[in-house]
A protein has these predicted regions:
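Mobile amphipathic helical/loop "lid" adjacent to a hydrophobic cofactor/ligand pocket
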Residues: 30, 41-168
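Short glycine/proline- and charge-enriched loop/turn segments
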Residues: 24-33, 173
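Conserved donor sugar-nucleotide recognition element shared by glycan-biosynthetic enzymes
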Residues: 18-19, 158-159, 187
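Active-site rim elements
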Residues: 33-37, 109-113, 178-182
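Short intrinsically disordered, low-complexity coil segments enriched in acidic
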Residues: 1-8, 133, 150, 192-193
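Helical element adjacent to the flavin cofactor pocket in flavoenzyme catalytic cores
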Residues: 164-194
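Glycine-rich FAD pyrophosphate-binding loop
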Residues: 2-25
Length: 194
């Protein structure tokens, strides 16, 4: 803030809000972020400009999603077709295949269907006619991982806001995401510079 006076107000005893790095590992020398983990240049231009101004070191990061549900009886990932069918028995599992069909339907139709600002995610799933496997083994775990929210609360989220987030972060596409980055040394590195 070369031309402005800035006052930081923080409720906690430390600065950073959800940017929290803890040291882990056998020697306690491995930084692990527990809140703010990744960002991309497409969706966070102000943050990335601040990082550039402050000289915050960043590195590319891989972001993918995988799920292990029902005590490991059903597992899959989204990084590749091989990951989707990590358990080859799912190739012949009609419920798993319907879940994949519902993923494609959701990705294709959610943006147009979620125009009503009063619609919840639960209402959106009903309107799209997706099945319980899609809800329980795809959307709820994915959304819960993104927002660190218990699965039982996701269905009450406003559909339009969540679907816009998915669209902005290329989560409604099966052709790829934005390149993700992380702060080298953990988010504490940018908090120290602020």
């Amino acid at each position: 803030a070369a031309t402005h006076d800035v006052t930081l107000i923080e409720a906690a005893g430390r600065l950073g809000g959800h940017a929290r790095t803890v040291m882990a590992g056998k020697r306690g020398d491995q930084p692990v972020d527990t809140g703010f983990i990744v960002f991309n240049y497409a969706n966070y231009p102000q943050l990335t400009a601040m990082f550039d101004d402050l000289g915050v070191p960043v590195v590319k990061s891989d972001m993918s999603f995988g799920a292990s549900v029902m005590g490991g009886r059903m597992e899959y990932g989204l990084a590749s077709l091989r990951a989707v069918f990590a358990q080859t028995r799912n190739i012949a599992n009609p419920r798993f295949l319907r879940m994949l069909r519902d993923v494609m339907r959701f990705n294709a139709r959610a943006l147009d269907t979620a125009q009503d600002s009063n619609m919840t995610i639960g209402g959106l799933l009903e309107a799209l006619g997706t099945g319980p496997w899609f809800r329980d083994y795809y959307l709820l775990p994915l959304s819960g991982a993104i927002w660190s929210t218990p699965k039982d609360r996701i269905l009450d989220f406003p559909a339009d806001a969540m679907i816009r987030f998915f669209e902005n972060h290329a989560l409604l596409s099966h052709t790829g995401q934005h390149q993700w980055y992380t702060v080298q040394g953990g988010s504490i590195e940018y908090v120290r510079r602020v």
